[in-house]
Regions:
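Loop/turn-rich, solvent-exposed surfaces of beta-rich toroidal or solenoidal domains
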Residues: 306-340, 344
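Long, well-ordered core segments of solenoidal/helical folds
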Residues: 13-33, 64-81, 108-127, 158-176, ...
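Solvent-exposed loop and edge beta-strand segments that line ligand/cofactor-binding
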Residues: 24-44, 73-88, 123-136, 190-207, ...
Length: 404
């Protein structure tokens, strides 16, 4: 019999308590704070959690407050910047997610003006801005792929593919990659901006670009071009893997550097493994899936010390670990992934038992302090989403983080 993830009665009670606490805190934040409207750290991300909390237990959520703030989000769309993190790409993703959650009342015209706005604003050849997902071009892919479930997004995805093609570095052996732009805020080496720098994180690097391109293989007019990009990029990415089997990490944070990286969504082996597995399954490349499984299983042996886990959030915290192993097990069912998910859930709930609500605080590496964070990526909202997913195995929201 396959190994199963399980929660004890006491753990279920603890999660129920946590969800009540988190819902109350996020509801207070939504009601009283002057929040930016973004998905990753603002109102949209907190509304996403409240929606899932309502599905879990409707009594936890003030429906009138949710409706009021969702209306405010929609009314403020014309005042937003465009990027995923705080801008329109993330907010519009949420609106499409909620639109699709009610199939009988789905409104196909709700976001057509946003489609056109993005098509026009992103159509620059060659692309000159950021290429990663938080502030850059790859961050428009979650919206485009979510919209493509219900409408033809050939034009919008075509613009995204054009931009990423225009910035790609191609090698004679067929490998393809992307160097961080010279003016990128995410460059590690800002002193030598003309030197190529190949970031290996899902949030800011090549794995994220691969994940952003992947849904476009479902679009007939783009399939051939996108397949070429994906195969060249995955082959390049696998060449960056360490040959040192004693290292904690298979990949570093940047190509050519030391093979040391944390466990997390943002950087590290886990989301590289996830991305390779998804491409391998989509393009029928079993070798990618095999390598992904090896990388994921290697990472499953790491704990909070070797994984540099210092807080709770989705980005690189212990609740984020539970969700990532949950997704890996959905992609590549394996007892070791179930065990790793169990480990991080047990660890997370034990932290709450020992430290209370402060165990949920976000760690700020600049001032070396823990603080409350109400947001999706680093704070309460994301932790709450992770907890609801433990009960129903529904990770249908993770496409906004390029994990589906």
């Amino acid at each position: 019999m396959a190994e199963q993830f399980s929660l004890s009665t006491q753990q279920r009670d603890t999660i129920n308590t946590l969800l009540a606490i988190i819902t109350d805190k996020v509801s207070t934040s939504v009601r009283d704070a002057d929040l930016p409207h973004g998905l990753l750290s603002g109102l949209a991300g907190q509304l996403l959690f409240l929606y899932k909390a309502y599905e879990y237990d409707a009594s936890l959520v003030d429906e009138a407050l949710f409706t009021e703030k969702l209306d405010a989000l929609q009314e403020g769309l014309d005042q937003q910047s465009f990027e995923m993190s705080n801008g329109l790409a993330g907010q519009a993703w949420l609106l499409e997610y909620l639109n699709q959650a009610d199939p009988e009342n789905y409104d196909p015209e709700l976001l057509e003006e946003i489609d056109e706005l993005f098509r026009e604003s992103l159509d620059h050849q060659p692309w000159q801005g950021e290429i990663e997902m938080v502030l850059g071009l790859s961050g428009f892919a979650p919206y485009a792929s979510r919209r493509a479930k219900q409408s033809d997004q050939t034009a919008l995805y075509g613009v995204i593919v054009n931009g990423l093609e225009s910035t790609a570095t191609r090698f004679d052996n067929g490998h393809i990659t992307w160097s961080q732009p010279q003016e990128s805020v995410y460059r590690f080496n800002k002193d030598e901006p003309t030197e190529p720098e190949y970031n290996l994180g899902l949030a800011h690097g090549v794995p994220g670009i691969i994940a952003a391109l992947l849904p476009a293989v479902q679009i007939p007019a783009l399939k051939e071009r996108v397949t070429t990009l994906l195969l060249g990029a995955c082959d390049w990415l696998l060449e960056q893997q360490s040959t040192d089997c004693t290292s904690h990490s298979c990949f570093g944070s940047s190509a050519g550097g030391e093979h040391h990286s944390r466990l997390g969504w943002c950087y590290g082996d886990l989301t590289i493994a996830m991305t390779l597995a998804r491409v391998g399954q989509q393009l029928d490349r079993p070798s990618y899936v095999e390598r992904a499984l090896e990388i994921g299983l290697h990472a499953a042996g790491r704990d909070e010390q070797s994984g540099h886990i210092t807080d709770a959030g989705l980005c690189h915290g212990f609740y984020g670990m539970a969700v990532i192993y949950q997704i890996l097990n959905q992609l590549m069912p394996h007892p070791r992934f179930v065990q790793a998910m169990q480990y991080w859930v047990d660890y997370s709930l034990r932290q709450y038992t020992e430290r209370g609500v402060e165990s949920l605080y976000s760690y700020n590496g600049l001032d070396k302090a823990y603080n409350e964070d109400f947001g999706f990526l680093m704070g309460y909202a994301g932790i709450g989403l992770a907890l609801t997913s433990l009960f129903d195995d529904d990770t249908g929201w993770v496409d906004c983080l390029l994990m589906a």
